[in-house]
From Swiss-Prot:
The keyword Cytoplasm applies. Its EC number is 6.3.5.3. Pathway: Purine metabolism; IMP biosynthesis via de novo pathway; 5-amino-1-(5-phospho-D-ribosyl)imidazole from N(2)-formyl-N(1)-(5-phospho-D-ribosyl)glycinamide: step 1/2. ATP binds at Y56, K95, D502, G539. This is Phosphoribosylformylglycinamidine synthase subunit PurL. Its main location: cytoplasm. It is found in: Cytoplasm. Mg(2+) 1 binds at E97, N540.
């Protein structure tokens, strides 16, 4: 690396502007925090730690809206992952993270390292990762070979990393929209299980205790990855692959086993542990010291390096993967080293804990950093962003909502099943191992993935849900509906919703309209979480998701987990037995704004999606879950994209069954996307009790048949379709698009 600038040259040439640090922030650091000019290494550390990706300096006021406490919450936001009590001294540990910019630039490695990073967040808590989910959002595939390539590589990256780790992928979601053409989204969620007594924290305390670096060696990959994720994205970034990390899942597997052995069997040696994620060593070390109200003194020459002549700046800001930082009690360094030696991993003491609150770095016999550690973590200048309601929303509030003109309901259903967001995503999920570890009860393709908790009768349900169209049209309502969609998916599987994690994917927060979208949608998420009793226990913020000034739809992703106390009561999504009665749960209205139907018929979205009656929906959803636990429900499937028509078809795919349904509404409403609805099937002998308990929240609409036909009678149309032909359309959509020559 060329000779670093002097502090005076930094002041004059302002290289920090390229690292997402403003001139105002630089002056504040000089005048109010350090009372001197920072050197090259120090300003690099400030740039990374004060980036939006690490500090949440713009989004923090909005994040304070979220409810984070609940009777089952053991650990909320602030640690590696959220921890939620699932009874019997056990907890589910989970978190979601975005890796959008790296995946857009280098799809395979961006996706793979996105999975790797979220695994480390979970096992650093003392939990064994048991499941991966992913929320993938691509541009249109048709006439877009670049997007098809990016999709293939992204899926391969997710699959290869998870498969090599031996952790099942239970699905998630895959959507397609032109707004993601220049900036795809990769949100990965990891779920782990642990005994609550084994929970670890990211603390660094105790003067003289060792700071130990464990795992893979440090290289030059990923330098300034945090600031890369905190700036506008443009065509220039298409070649910025040095900011993308390179993953090694086999190394991660060894690291996971070594860390879990240390935590579970020798925790008396350990004070704290944290993943080296965004901003690498500086982030993990500074955060651990701050959490422990301590100082830290590190010798960077002791850091294991895989490349020669690395500068202090490069060592500290590298985001090389498969690395952890430990705080180990003095005198147990060799004990810890022996564990990692058994796994062929580096384990090196690179520094000590101090009590002066200073963050001191040595390199090549020079002190290259000596600053108060809190200046990196707690003295960040929070930025108050301007907000402005977009004119498009003001205009639409004064206009009538779009209503479809459907000629043939059957033809419309066939066309919807051929939309890639609705179509079968087996092209994606078949590349994942969903059965490894042999605990999977329900894998990809259902409303929720479900995994049994070993040595118990319990099961954990999990889902990821995003709908940027609704949030774009009405951010607050869209936020509510996204959380509700997750809760409906969890209940459809027979589980009680417990808590959520999130990935908040938005454009440039310096745009007042985009910040307004962020604020309003987070308010909607908070409102829904409060009412549904699903606190936010972890998550992340990913801003600047734009390409050449064009932002994605505001796309908050909700990852939710639920508890099934007896896995004998897991509810399948497919109809089970001919003769069972079919019920529609929830009321249907003409809700087409942002729907798949609207996009398909008009090529655009418009209008205002309807606000859900959250208290009323919560009442019947949770009542339904209790009846499921009592064995009164045979199957259940939520209604989302494509509405009732699509869900009825999906409920008999891969079966020898059909449905005969009579509806008291018109053909338009067959494809309405009113939220909070499900279709359930109930055995005739349980129907009376089911109806009595559910009351007017349900209406009987038909029965399951054995003729493999989808028969739907409407007030102004009739659908008579062969299930096998519908399924063929649904299954072939994405493979056909991927094989396209255009």
């Amino acid at each position: 690396m060329k000779q670093a600038m002097t502090p005076e040259e930094i002041k004059e040439k302002k290289p920090y502007l390229d690292w997402s640090l403003s001139e105002h922030e630089y002056d504040y650091i000089c005048d109010h925090l350090l009372h001197r000019l920072p050197n090259y290494t120090e300003i690099g550390l400030f740039s990374a730690m004060w980036s939006e990706h690490c500090s949440y300096k713009k989004s923090k006021p909005v994040l304070k809206l979220f409810p984070t406490k609940g009777k089952r919450v053991v650990q909320g936001p602030g640690e590696g992952a959220g921890v939620v009590d699932i009874d019997d001294g056990q907890a589910v540990v989970f978190k979601a993270e975005s890796h959008n910019h790296p995946t857009t630039v280098e799809p395979y490695q961006g996706a793979a390292t996105g999975v790797g990073g979220i695994l480390r967040d979970v096992f650093s808590m003392g939990a064994r990762p048991v499941a991966i989910l992913d929320s993938l959002h691509f541009g249109e595939l048709k006439d877009n070979p670049t997007m098809r390539y990016k999709m293939e590589e992204t899926i391969k990256g997710v699959g290869d990393y998870g498969n090599c780790m031996g952790i099942p992928n239970l699905g998630g979601e895959t959507t397609f929209d032109p707004c993601y053409n220049g900036n795809i989204l990769l949100n990965a969620m990891n779920v782990g299980i642990m005994d609550i007594k084994d929970m670890e924290h990211g603390d660094a305390t105790g003067v003289g205790n060792a700071v130990m670096y464990v795992g893979a060696k440090t290289g030059r990959d990923g330098i300034h990855g945090a600031t890369f994720a905190s700036a506008d994205f443009s065509e220039e970034h298409a070649t910025q692959r040095s900011a993308v990390q390179v993953g090694d899942p086999f190394m991660e597997k060894l690291l996971m086993e070594a860390c879990l052995e240390l935590i579970l069997h020798h925790r008396e040696w350990l004070v704290g542990i944290q993943d080296m994620g965004a901003a690498g060593i500086v982030s993990s070390s500074a955060e651990m010291a701050t959490e422990g109200k301590s100082g830290m003194d590190l010798n960077l020459n002791l850091v294991p390096q895989r490349e020669p002549n690395m500068s202090a700046y490069e060592i500290m800001l590298s985001e090389s993967q498969e690395r952890m930082l430990l705080c180990v009690k003095k005198g147990h360094e060799e004990d810890v080293k022996k564990i990692f030696d058994e796994y062929n991993l580096d384990a090196v003491t690179i520094g000590r804990i101090t009590d002066d609150g200073r963050y001191v770095l040595h390199h090549d016999d020079q002190v290259v950093c000596d600053i108060p550690v809190v200046t990196l973590t707690e003295k960040v200048l929070e930025e108050k962003s301007e907000e402005k309601k977009p004119q498009r929303i003001i205009d639409v509030e004064q206009s009538e909502n779009w209503q479809p003109e459907i000629e043939d309901a059957g033809q419309t259903l066939r066309a919807l099943l051929n939309q890639p967001t609705i179509a079968n995503d087996q092209f994606v999920t078949q590349q994942y191992d969903s059965q490894v570890r042999t605990d999977t009860i329900v894998g990809p393709g259902s409303d929720s993935g479900i995994l049994r908790v070993r040595h118990t009768k319990k099961a954990i349900a999990m889902t990821t849900d995003t709908n940027g169209r609704f949030v774009y049209l009405d951010p607050k309502v869209g936020g509510q509906r996204t959380v509700l969609e997750s809760a409906t998916n969890i209940v459809a599987s027979g589980a009680l919703p417990l808590a959520i994690t999130d990935c908040l994917n938005y454009g440039d927060p310096n745009d007042p309209e985009i910040f307004w979208e962020l604020h309003q949608s987070c308010q909607g998420i908070a409102d829904a979480c409060e009412i549904l009793e699903t606190p936010v226990v972890s998550g992340n913020v990913s801003l600047y998701n734009e390409n050449n000034g064009k932002a994605i739809y505001p796309s908050p992703m909700i990852g939710m987990v639920g508890l099934i106390k007896n896995y004998d009561h897991v509810i399948p999504m497919h109809m089970q037995t001919a003769g069972d009665k079919i019920y529609l749960v929830g009321k249907t209205d003409d809700d087409f704004a942002g729907s798949e139907l609207q996009k398909m018929m008009t090529g655009k979205i418009s209008g205002l999606p309807h606000a859900p009656n959250l208290p009323g929906i919560k009442d019947y959803l949770y009542k339904l879950q209790k009846l499921m636990a009592e064995g009164l429900v045979q199957s259940a499937h939520d209604l989302s994209e494509g509405g009732l028509g699509v869900s009825l078809a999906e409920s008999v795919f891969d079966t020898d069954l059909g449905v005969n349904v009579k509806l008291d509404f018109n053909k338009n409403l067959l494809f309405s996307e009113t939220p909070g609805r499900l279709i359930v099937s109930v055995a005739p002998e349980n129907a009376a009790k089911f109806e009595q308990e559910m009351g007017d929240a349900v209406s009987e609409i038909g029965q399951v048949t054995d003729d493999k036909q989808l028969n739907i009678s409407l007030t102004n149309d009739q659908v008579n379709e062969d299930v096998a032909k519908l399924q063929k359309i649904w299954k072939e959509c994405i493979p056909c698009l991927m094989k396209s020559k255009a």
